[in-house]
């Protein structure tokens, strides 16, 4: 039986693990050969010292080697936040996914239940009536017929069951928050990824480049793991093999600046109701932040020329009823009913 203890000692000493060692350590954890306390100790040793790009890449390699894949079109994208930002905000990326799909871009959405917040993507989508435990074939059909499929992380990364209890007991963000957006079961090549701290912007853009992404924006919104309308958003954009950084304010793209309090969400049922309200065309700060993120996603997808163009397309997706129609189709297909 392989032993995690040498890797714990190495991480705790402050020494970075090479990619091969990181993969080996995650292979041990993902195959059930480590105790919950060993897993917790290893994850916190990495967090306190600070995870490195090779460690993240090694961990992703371990996860990808075990995942149940989903077939999606080549132009499909993911819109996902790492979580762990402690903001308790609405489910921005989930709502954004429907708007982007309504604008004609296939979305393979990867997500989980809440670990460090009150409502994760899976919690809100389940509250809306989506079967989050649909199998890979059904999800593939949902992407092709409805324009969006939701991939519930534990269904595709069953090896995660070995680390889940430790993550919940820790109750704080770990390297696994970084891994979810990098381990999409549909192997998408276009991503809008929100991170919980600005120091991860460029490292994650580099990891995505190493892992074969074509276009990606990694964003941090002044305390949110999404682009924000309550402050300034920092972006590390991977485009044409190059990574560039820039900032965006809501005013420069014609959106109203709101207060952080206006973006506060609640439990899953409350967040689901608010998400439905946005798709039904209700005006709110939640709608504005979804428009901003949708505009960016449409730029990443190559559907929009620039952010203002993307936001205009997002407005059309909502106001025409297209985004709401995507939700209704996904509910039907995920529950094995005709779209």
Swiss-Prot record:
Anthranilate 1 binds at residues 81, 112. The keyword Lipid biosynthesis does not apply. Mg(2+) 1 binds at residues 93, 226. One of its GO terms (molecular function) is anthranilate phosphoribosyltransferase activity. Homodimer. Belongs to the anthranilate phosphoribosyltransferase family. This is Anthranilate phosphoribosyltransferase.
């Amino acid at each position: 039986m392989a032993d995690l203890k040498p890797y714990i000692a190495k991480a705790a000493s402050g020494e970075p693990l090479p990619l091969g060692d990181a993969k080996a350590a995650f292979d041990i954890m993902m195959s059930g050969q480590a105790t919950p306390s060993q897993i917790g100790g290893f994850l916190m040793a990495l967090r306190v010292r600070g995870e490195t790009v090779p460690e993240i890449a090694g961990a992703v390699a371990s996860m990808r080697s075990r995942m149940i894949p989903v077939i999606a079109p080549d132009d499909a994208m993911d819109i996902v936040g790492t979580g762990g930002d402690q903001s308790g905000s609405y489910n921005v990326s989930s709502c954004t996914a429907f708007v982007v799909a309504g604008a004609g871009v296939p979305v393979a959405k990867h997500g989980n239940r809440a670990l460090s917040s009150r409502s994760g993507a899976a919690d809100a989508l389940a509250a809306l009536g989506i079967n989050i435990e649909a199998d890979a074939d059904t999800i593939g059909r949902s992407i092709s017929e409805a324009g969006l499929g939701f991939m519930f992380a534990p269904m595709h990364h069953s090896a995660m069951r070995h680390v889940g209890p430790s993550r919940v007991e820790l109750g704080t963000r770990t390297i696994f928050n970084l891994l979810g957006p990098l381990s999409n079961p549909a192997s998408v090549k276009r991503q809008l990824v929100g991170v919980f701290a600005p120091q991860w912007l460029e490292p994650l853009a580099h990891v995505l480049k190493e892992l074969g992404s074509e276009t990606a924006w990694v964003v941090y919104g002044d305390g949110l793991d999404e682009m924000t309308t309550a402050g300034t958003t920092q972006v590390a954009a991977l485009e044409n093999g190059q990574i560039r950084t820039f900032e965006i304010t809501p005013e420069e793209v014609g959106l109203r600046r709101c207060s952080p309090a206006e973006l506060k969400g609640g439990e899953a049922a409350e967040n689901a109701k608010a998400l439905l309200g946005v798709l039904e065309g209700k005006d709110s700060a939640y709608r504005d932040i979804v428009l901003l993120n949708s505009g960016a996603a449409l730029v990443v997808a190559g559907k929009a020329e620039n952010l203002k163009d993307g936001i205009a397309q997002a407005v059309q997706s909502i106001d025409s009823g297209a985004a709401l129609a995507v939700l209704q189709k996904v509910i039907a297909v995920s529950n094995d009913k005709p779209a």
